[in-house]
């Protein structure tokens, strides 16, 4: 049956997304300019933030790049922000974009080694509780020295590998796309696959939270940590020690949550690795070991050496540049010289890189319209004793709906400005820096918006395979969110001041001399 031009345009608009979703996006595009010009730019700015969060929440209905991008283009077009401000935000976050483009692609060329190591881990640790703890601890440790996005990229790569191996076997070795379950013809296989999905979901969430537990501890764990450390004049050791009064209790309780949710099967956790899947992975491992040639063994050794280089080099150059060196070294010594083979490595990260660039446009609107200014002013007007908790809570709240790099940067700049103008003392500024860092890193696990690693997981090729939606991520993160936020708040409120004083008296902390530029330690 023929359709009209209007119907054809509507069908093409956002493709196979539900009609109600298409109407919602069109509604946003109509309402936003009206509110901006006739009601209030401030209200329109907050509406844009909420609408962008909505597109992220509906990531499984439609990839957020298209609807979010349309909203961002309109925001620039009507004057909510300027192309210059967007370009400035992109320039400020160039490290993160380079990380996504090159580091994630670099990890792709180390997949053989990662699959080899994690298959051994998965098959040798039969207790799901201990395995979950191992994933959480490994992610926390790696995130203290690597960027959380890199760690998540590793775990995603491994999980896709596991899923592909089992899916190919259970769908009768079909060469079809692994997103297509039509080759699985009996009920038992479907149930096993669903259980395997639940198993992978729980491991991914434990690993994701692990990146937050480890990432908050060191100045290289998250991009905003570097900004905060630079502003306060702390080196690697200073930063680690100053954070300990808050981060150590949170780390311990975070691991406790990991054990409890697995043991009592709470919040979607507790799914075991199905025995059928274990058999398939064991057979795959045995066959792979038997077939492995000397050439392939040398590839694994080369990839292991490159892995060591990856960890050591992160302190020598920008993360993205290290990622580029990983691509060059891995492809050179593993014999990958075909352009088509190289291109596959970039497929996973580039859509998310584009989405993150759109996100920076939304951040530019937040800056241009001063959406966070009333909250910041309210916090700075509070008494010094209340400031720490308020900074922590408002940082956490705003980081859950915005980019934690942006929130951390805005707050540390405001705190630094308050110190330079004599509103807060040096000691108070340093305590505020701890509250800001922990506030941006801990409560932000509540939603994928707050943590770039969570957002990357949500929009990755793995999420639809294991049925990991925005809502499910929020639900599964809830026990961690509550415990980490509350323990962090108690640490800021009751432990931070006395422990910092004790560490200073014990000689573990030296007071920096802060100039008008950058803080410089004695």
Swiss-Prot record:
One of its GO terms (molecular function) is sodium:proton antiporter activity. Keywords: Antiport, Cell inner membrane, Cell membrane, Ion transport, Membrane, Sodium, Sodium transport, Transmembrane, Transmembrane helix, Transport. It catalyses: 2 Na(+)(in) + 3 H(+)(out) = 2 Na(+)(out) + 3 H(+)(in). It is a multi-pass membrane protein. It is found in: Cell inner membrane. It comes from the Bacteria. The keyword DNA damage does not apply. The keyword Ribonucleoprotein does not apply. The chain crosses the membrane at residues 13-33, 98-118, 140-160, 239-259, 304-324, 356-376, 390-410, 446-466, 477-497. GO terms for cellular component: plasma membrane. Na(+)/H(+) antiporter that extrudes sodium in exchange for external protons. Belongs to the NhaB Na(+)/H(+) (TC 2.A.34) antiporter family. HAMAP family: NhaB. This is Na(+)/H(+) antiporter NhaB. The gene is nhaB.
């Amino acid at each position: 049956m023929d359709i009209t031009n209007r119907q054809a345009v509507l069908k093409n608009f956002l493709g196979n997304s539900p009609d109600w979703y298409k109407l919602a996006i069109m509604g946003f595009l109509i309402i936003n300019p009206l509110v901006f010009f006739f009601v209030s730019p401030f209200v329109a700015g907050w509406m844009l933030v909420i609408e962008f969060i909505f597109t992220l929440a509906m990531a499984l209905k439609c990839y957020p790049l298209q609807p979010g991008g349309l909203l961002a283009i309109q925001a620039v077009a009507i004057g909510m922000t300027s192309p210059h401000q967007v370009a400035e935000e992109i320039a400020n976050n160039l490290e993160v974009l380079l990380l996504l483009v090159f580091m994630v692609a670099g990890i792709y060329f180390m997949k053989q080694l990662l699959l080899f190591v994690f298959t051994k881990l998965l098959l040798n640790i039969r207790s799901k509780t201990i395995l979950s703890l191992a994933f959480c601890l490994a992610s926390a440790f790696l995130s203290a020295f690597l960027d959380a996005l890199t760690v998540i990229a590793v775990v995603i790569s491994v999980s896709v590998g596991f899923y592909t191996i089992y899916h190919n076997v259970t769908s009768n070795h079909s060469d079809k796309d692994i997103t297509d379950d039509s080759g699985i013809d009996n009920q038992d296989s479907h149930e096993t696959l669903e259980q395997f999905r639940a198993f992978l979901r729980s491991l991914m969430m434990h690993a994701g939270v692990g990146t937050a537990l480890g990432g908050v501890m060191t100045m290289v764990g998250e991009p905003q940590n570097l900004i905060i450390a630079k502003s306060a004049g702390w080196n690697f050791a200073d930063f680690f020690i100053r954070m300990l009064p808050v981060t150590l209790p949170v780390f311990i309780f975070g691991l406790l949550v990991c054990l409890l949710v697995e043991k009592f099967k709470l919040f979607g956790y507790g799914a075991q690795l199905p025995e059928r899947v274990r058999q398939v992975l064991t057979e795959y491992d045995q066959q792979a070991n038997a077939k492995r040639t000397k050439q392939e063994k040398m590839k694994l050794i080369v990839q292991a050496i490159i892995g060591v280089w990856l960890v050591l080099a992160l302190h020598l150059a920008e993360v993205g540049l290290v990622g580029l060196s990983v691509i060059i070294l891995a492809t050179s010594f593993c014999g990958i010289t075909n352009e088509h083979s190289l291109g596959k490595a970039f497929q996973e990260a580039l859509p998310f890189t584009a989405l993150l660039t759109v996100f920076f446009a939304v951040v530019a609107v937040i800056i241009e319209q001063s959406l966070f200014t009333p909250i910041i002013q309210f916090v700075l007007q509070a008494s010094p004793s209340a400031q720490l908790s308020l900074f922590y809570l408002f940082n956490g709240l705003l980081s859950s709906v915005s980019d934690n790099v942006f929130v951390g940067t805005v707050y540390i700049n405001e705190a630094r400005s308050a110190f330079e103008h004599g509103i807060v003392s040096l000691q108070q500024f340093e305590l505020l820096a701890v509250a800001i860092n922990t506030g941006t890193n801990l409560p932000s696990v509540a939603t994928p918006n707050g943590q770039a690693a969570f957002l990357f997981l949500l929009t990755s090729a793995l999420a639809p395979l294991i049925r990991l939606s925005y809502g499910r991520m929020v639900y599964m993160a809830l026990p961690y969110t509550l415990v980490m936020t509350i323990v962090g708040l108690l640490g800021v409120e009751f432990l931070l001041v006395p422990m910092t004083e004790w560490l200073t008296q014990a000689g573990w902390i030296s007071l920096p001399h802060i100039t008008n530029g950058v803080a410089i330690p004695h």
